[in-house]
C-alpha cells in the first residue's frame, strides 16, 4: 500500500507516518509485520484529527480508513504506538556451510524481543509444541531446518527455512610422480565464454595462474590444469574472481561458473574433499579492456587465502583414479 516513516514523541511514544499510495478497496489498512497495539490513529490532513478505528487483522495492526480517499496521490495516516515498534521478524538460521560430512551445528537467532524460538527439522511448520531453541541444533543427517518466533504460545513471525545436506567427500586420485606447477593451454580469439576455446596456440607449464605467456593483451584465453593438494578431509570453499569470464573445475566437475563477459566479479562454490590430490582446472578469458584473475580457497584450519604454487602440482607419471 505504500511506505512508513517514524518519529519519536514524548512519553516513549513512537509516531508512525503511513504514506498510502494505493488506497485499500476494503477500507482496511493492514500493516504487515507490525505487532504493536495502536494508542491512536488519524489522518495527517484532517484538521480535527478525528480518530480512526484500529484493531487486528491476521494478527497484524489494521486501521479502518474513510470511504473517500482524501488524496489520490499520497494520503498520510498517523498511528501512535507505545514504545518501539514490535515488528515480526523471521528468525535467522545459519551454519558454517549448507553441506557437511559428519555433523553440523546450526544456530537459530532473532532480533525480535520477548520471544521464544521453536524449530523443526523435518520440513514441517513449527508450532507452539515444537522443540525450543536453547542452543545450537546438531544435525547428523540431511534436514530442512524451519524456525519461527512465538510469544505466549502464539506465532509472531514468518517462518524461516534452510536446507542442509550431508555429503560424502570426493576421493583423491593417485599419481606416481608430481612436479610443482600447472599446465596451461593458451588460446586466441573473440570469446564470449570459456567453452568457446578450440585449438590452443601453445602449451606449457607455469607456477600458478600466470598470464605472462600471452602474446596479446586482449582476445585471449588460458586453461590451467593439474592437481590440487588438499590437506585435510572437509568442506572447502573456492572463490573465483575474474574479468572477463572464468570457470573452476574440481575432479572434472564445474564448481564455480563465473563465465561470460563482465567486469571484475567474484563467485564461490563449495565441495567436500578427502585429503590428497584432486583434479583441478581453471579456464579464463579476456575480451577487451582490463583483465583480472584471482583464485582463493578456504577449508578446515585453512583461512581464506590465494591458491599458490605450494598448492598445485602436475603429474609426471601415471594417474590412477579412485572410485568416488
Please describe what each predicted stretch is:
Residues 1-93:
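Mature catalytic domains of secreted/periplasmic carbohydrate-active enzymes
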Residues 24, 34-38, 110-116, 241-245:
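Short proline/glycine-enriched turn/loop motifs at strand-loop junctions of beta-rich domains
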Residues 83-182, 191, 195, 199-223, ...:
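Short, compositionally stereotyped local motifs that mark structural "simplifiers"
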Residues 239-257, 294-297:
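Short, surface-exposed beta-strand/strand-loop-strand elements in extracellular ectodomains
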Residues 27, 140-143, 232-238, 274-277:
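Short tyrosine-centred short linear motifs in exposed loops/low-complexity segments
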Residues 108-110, 228-230, 234-248, 280:
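Aromatic-lined ligand-binding clefts that engage carbohydrates, nucleic acids, or primary amines
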Residues 41, 117-119, 246-248, 293:
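Short beta-strand elements bearing conserved aromatic residues within extracellular beta-rich modules
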Residues 281-290:
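Short beta-strand-plus-loop segments that form exposed binding edges in beta-rich domains
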Amino acid at each position: 500500500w505504500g511506505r512508513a516513516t517514524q518519529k519519536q514523541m514524548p512519553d516513549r511514544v513512537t509516531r508512525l507516518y503511513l504514506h498510502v499510495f494505493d488506497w485499500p478497496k476494503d477500507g482496511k489498512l493492514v500493516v504487515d509485520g507490525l505487532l504493536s497495539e495502536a494508542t491512536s490513529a488519524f489522518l495527517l490532513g484532517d484538521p480535527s484529527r478525528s480518530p480512526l478505528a484500529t484493531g487486528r487483522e491476521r494478527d497484524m495492526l489494521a486501521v479502518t480508513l474513510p470511504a473517500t480517499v482524501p488524496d489520490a496521490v499520497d494520503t498520510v495516516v498517523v498511528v501512535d504506538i507505545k514504545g518501539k515498534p514490535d515488528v515480526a521478524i523471521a528468525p535467522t538460521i545459519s551454519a558454517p556451510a549448507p553441506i557437511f560430512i559428519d555433523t553440523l551445528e546450526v544456530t537459530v537467532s532473532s532480533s525480535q524481543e520477548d520471544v521464544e524460538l521453536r524449530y523443526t527439522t523435518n520440513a514441517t511448520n513449527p508450532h507452539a509444541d515444537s522443540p525450543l531453541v536453547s542452543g545450537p541444533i546438531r544435525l547428523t543427517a540431511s534436514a530442512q531446518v524451519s524456525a519461527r518466533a512465538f510469544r505466549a504460545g502464539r506465532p509472531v513471525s514468518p517462518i524461516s527455512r534452510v536446507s542442509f545436506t550431508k555429503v560424502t567427500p570426493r576421493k583423491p586420485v593417485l599419481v606416481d610422480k608430481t612436479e610443482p606447477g600447472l599446465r596451461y593451454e593458451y588460446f586466441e580469439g573473440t570469446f564470449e565464454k570459456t567453452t568457446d576455446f578450440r585449438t590452443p596456440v601453445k602449451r606449457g607449464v607455469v607456477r600458478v595462474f600466470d598470464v605472462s605467456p600471452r602474446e596479446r593483451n586482449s582476445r585471449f584465453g588460458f586453461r590451467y590444469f593439474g592437481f590440487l593438494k588438499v590437506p585435510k578431509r572437509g568442506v572447502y570453499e573456492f572463490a573465483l574472481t575474474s574479468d572477463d569470464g572464468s570457470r573452476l573445475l574440481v575432479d572434472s566437475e564445474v564448481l564455480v561458473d563465473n563465465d561470460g563477459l563482465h567486469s571484475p566479479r567474484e563467485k564461490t562454490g563449495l565441495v567436500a574433499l578427502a585429503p590428497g590430490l584432486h583434479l583441478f582446472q581453471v579456464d579464463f578469458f579476456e575480451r577487451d579492456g582490463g583483465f583480472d584473475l584471482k583464485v582463493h580457497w578456504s577449508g578446515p584450519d585453512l583461512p581464506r587465502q590465494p591458491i599458490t604454487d605450494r598448492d598445485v602440482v602436475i603429474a609426471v607419471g601415471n594417474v590412477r583414479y579412485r572410485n568416488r
